[in-house]
């Protein structure tokens, strides 16, 4: 399966059978910042934004004072799983990032998708990739 198929079929899919419940954007990005696959709506990000995200995985709490920035959008960092998951909130939407051995799985959402639904979709694919040694 291509990386694009993982994004299209496992991240940008209907959530829990609701056609109107989909992530607004998603991507799989290598630890080096190279995009493996992304939705058409995934924001252009700056290298320093990706560096900040990677630093937070290695040094949990790094982004808390400044917020998580992606594509120029600032998210307030909320409780995640140290070294494994970063979660951010902005208004009625947010972001979930799951770290695997070689990649970061991104999901961005807004209402009617809930934070829990975004977490489920992103972390399910991330856990699968971890099981595959990726």
From Swiss-Prot:
It comes from the Eukaryota. Disulfide bonds join 13-118. Keywords: Actin-binding, Allergen, Cytoplasm, Cytoskeleton, Disulfide bond, Phosphoprotein. The keyword Phosphoprotein applies. One of its GO terms (molecular function) is actin monomer binding. GO terms for cellular component: cell cortex; cytoskeleton. Signal peptide: none annotated. The modification Phosphothreonine is found at residue 114. The keyword Ubl conjugation does not apply. Phosphorylated by MAP kinases. It is found in: Cytoplasm, Cytoskeleton. Belongs to the profilin family. Occurs in many kinds of cells as a complex with monomeric actin in a 1:1 ratio. Binds to actin and affects the structure of the cytoskeleton. At high concentrations, profilin prevents the polymerization of actin, whereas it enhances it at low concentrations. The variability of the residues taking part of IgE-binding epitopes might be responsible of the difference in cross-reactivity among olive pollen cultivars, and between distantly related pollen species, leading to a variable range of allergy reactions among atopic patients. This is Profilin-4.
